[in-house]
Amino acid sequence: MIMCGITAIFNIHDGAQALRKQALLMSKRIRHRGPDWSGIYQGKTAILAHERLSIVDPASGGQPLVSPDGKLILCVNGEIYNHQELRERLKGDYEFQTGSDCEVILALYKKKGIDFIEDLNGIFAFALYDEEKEVYLIARDPIGVIPLYIGYDDEGHLMVSSELKGLEGFATHYEPFLPGHYFYSEDRKLTRWYTRDWMDYANVKDNPTDVQQLHDALEAAVKRQLMSDVPYGVLLSGGLDSSITSAIAKKYAAKRIETNGKADAWWPQLHSFAIGLKDAPDLIAARKVADAIGTVHHEIHYTIQEGLDALRDVIYHIETYDVTTVRASTPMYLLARVIRSMGIKMVLSGEGADEVFGGYLYFHKAPNAQAFHEETLRKLSKLYLYDCLRANKSLCAWGVEGRVPFLDKEFLDVAMRLNPVAKMCPGTTIEKKILREAFSDSLPKEIAWRQKEQFSDGVGYGWIDTLKKITSESVTDEEMANAAKRFPINPPQNKEEYYYRSIFEEHFPSESAARSVPSIPSVACSTAEALAWDSAFKNMNEPSGRAIKGVHESACLLYTSDA
C-alpha cells in the first residue's frame, strides 16, 4: 500500500534524456506527497516517476513496480483493499515480487488486459506502461479520492501528475482526470469503467431499507481500511461521521486485520485528532466521543492568525480557490503537520457521508425522493473537486495518508441502493437519521443526534467570520467591479473568492489551472440544480451551513428522547 505522488510522460519519440530531467522536476514538485523514497523508470517511449509514502511493505514495496519479465512498469498512488483476495486468486498466474498491495494491478493486467479495473476495491490513480506493446493505461478510482491530472504539450507528449503543480509550466493544456475512467493509448480516449445500477433512480425507488445491512457494510469498510504496517490514527471532529468511523476503528484496533484478528496490532492504542479554535463546537464534541470510545485523544488549538498566515501555503497545496474548500482545508492542513510530527502516517476520515446520505442542511428542502437521490448522485460525482481534493491534498502536504470508509466501493453499493425515502429529512426530521439509527448504540446520545456542522464551521465560527472580514477589507470595490476583466475564466463572485483567486493565480498562472477549479452558485454546499428547491436560495451565495436560515440555529435533538 502506497500513498504517494506519481508523474509520467508518454508518447516519447526523441529527446528522452531531456524529458527525463523534466520528469524529475515534475516529480520533485510533488515530493511532499511521498517523502520516503523516489523512483524513476525511463523506457523507449515513456518515463514514469514516483514519490513514495510507505504504508504497507515499507522495505520492498518501492516503485515503479516492474513485472517479473521486466515488460510491465507501474506507478500507483493508492490503496487496494482487496489485494489479499486478489493475490490468492492470481498466485498461479503471476510471480509476485513484493508485498505491495498495488502489485496485483500488474498481475491483473497480465491476465486480463485492460478489463480488470472493476476487480479493484480501493482508492487509486495509476499509470501502467507495457514496454513490449508500447502502450499505456491510466486510470482513476470510482469517486476520485486520489487526485490525478492529465495534460499535453505542443510536441504531442501526454503527461499525468498527482497534482496540477506537476504539469504547470510543462503541459500546454491540462485538466483533472475524470474519476471512474481510464485512458488506454490504443483507444486514444477516456472511457468510463465505473457504472452502477443505483445511478438511475428507477432502480432504487422501490428498494427495501435494511438498517442492519447498512451498519454491517460500513463496519466492514472501516475494518478493510485498517491494513497498515505503520502507525495510524483517526480524525475525530466530534461530528457524526468521524465519530462513527472512529468508534468502529477502535473496535478493531487491538488486532492486525491482515491476520484476521489472530495477531496483536503493532500499535494497539488508537490515536484520535481534533483541531479548532479554543472552545470550538468540534473540540467539545470530540472530547466526549474520545472519552466514550477510549482513544488516545489529541486536541490541537490554532489561532485565527495562524490560519491566516497559512493561507498562501494552503492554496498552493490544495490547488483551488473554491471558498468552502479553502476555509475547511486550512485547519486540516495545520492538523496534518502535527499528526506527522507524532509519527502517524495514515488517518481515517469521515468524508463522503454527507453526499451519500444527504447530510447537508439544504437537503431538508428536497421536494421528493427522486430529487433527493439525484442530488446525492450529483454531489458524489463532484466530490473529487471539493472534499476529496481537500482531504487528500491537505494531508499529503505533510506526508499523511487519508482513508475514507464512507466512499468504499462495496459500502457505496449498499448505501446508494437504499430506498431514498429512508434518507430524506423533511420538515423537522434530522438529517442522516438512518445512519444515526444504525450506530446510535456506538456513540453518546448527544453525539449520535448532534446536528450537522461543516468542518469550517465546527472548528470555530470566528474563523469564517474573520476570513470574510479580512478578505473584504483587502479587496477594494473597484477591484471587485473589474473582477471579470482580471479573471475572465470563472470570475470571482465575492471578495473572499477574489482574495483566494489572486493567491491561486500567483502560484498557478495558466488558463488550465483556472479552469481546473469549479465555480458555481451554491447555498450551504448545494449544487446549482438544488437552488430551485427554495426560492430564497436564489438570493444567496454562501457555502456555509449557516446559510440555511433557522436550521443551523436550532439544536436539532429531535430524536434524543426515543433514540
Language-model segment annotations:
Residues 2-321:
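Cysteine-centered catalytic environments shared across enzyme families
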Residues 127, 323-335, 377-380, 476-480:
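Short, basic, helix/turn surface patches
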Residues 344-354, 360:
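Short acidic/histidine-rich active-site segments
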Residues 30, 225, 253, 257, ...:
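A generic secondary-structure signal for well-formed alpha-helical elements
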Residues 19, 82, 98-101, 120, ...:
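Hydrophobic (often cysteine-bearing) scaffold residues that line and stabilize catalytic clefts
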Residues 106-107, 243-247, 336-337, 358, ...:
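Short, hydrophobic alpha-helix immediately C-terminal to the catalytic nucleophile
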Residues 1-6, 341-348, 367, 372-561:
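Adenosyl-5′-phosphate
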Residues 211, 275-336, 362-371, 393-394, ...:
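ATP-dependent adenylate-handling ligase core
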